[in-house]
């Protein structure tokens, strides 16, 4: 079996908070009924899928770039940085990464960009769910520290 990772991000279009990327390697067989792009799944269903993905995935990596760094290097570079960070946390190292959108400029892992990959490829859908739930949990913590923070997103 070729080891393939799916990669996606959450928070790129948001007004506040970090950008979070996730890389996921799924086994050949998995049971992720209802898996879809995180934007098309309700928050409660995302939480259920998050638990299923984390219990079934071979490996999951998450990269987080905080807002202060986004302001310094821009959102596009921050997104790429978070994606590279997430790939660097995978064990085993994938033979190829499928990136939602455009490919990463990196020689570390061969990769392909797939437009709308979060709508068509399960391993990217899984990465989408992990990134979105992780970011949402961060934003809830921010809102607890700074009331009304969630109203900014």
Task: Locate each region found by the language model.
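RNase H-like, Mg2+-dependent phosphodiesterase core
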Residues: 1-153
């Amino acid at each position: 079996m070729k080891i393939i990772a799916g990669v996606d991000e959450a928070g790129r279009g948001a007004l506040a908070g970090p950008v979070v990327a996730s890389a996921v390697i799924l086994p050949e067989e998995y049971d992720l009924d209802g898996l879809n792009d995180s934007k098309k799944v309700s928050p409660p269903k995302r939480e259920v899928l998050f638990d299923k993905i984390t219990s079934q995935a071979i490996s999951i990596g998450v990269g987080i770039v905080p807002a202060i760094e986004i302001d310094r290097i821009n959102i596009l570079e921050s997104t790429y940085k978070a994606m590279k960070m997430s790939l660097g946390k995978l064990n085993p190292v994938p033979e190829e990464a499928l990136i939602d959108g455009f490919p990463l400029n990196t020689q570390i892992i061969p990769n392909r960009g797939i437009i709308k990959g979060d709508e068509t490829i399960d391993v990217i859908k899984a990465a989408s769910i992990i990134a979105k739930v992780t970011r949402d949990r961060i934003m809830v913590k921010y809102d607890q520290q700074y009331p009304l923070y969630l109203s900014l997103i």
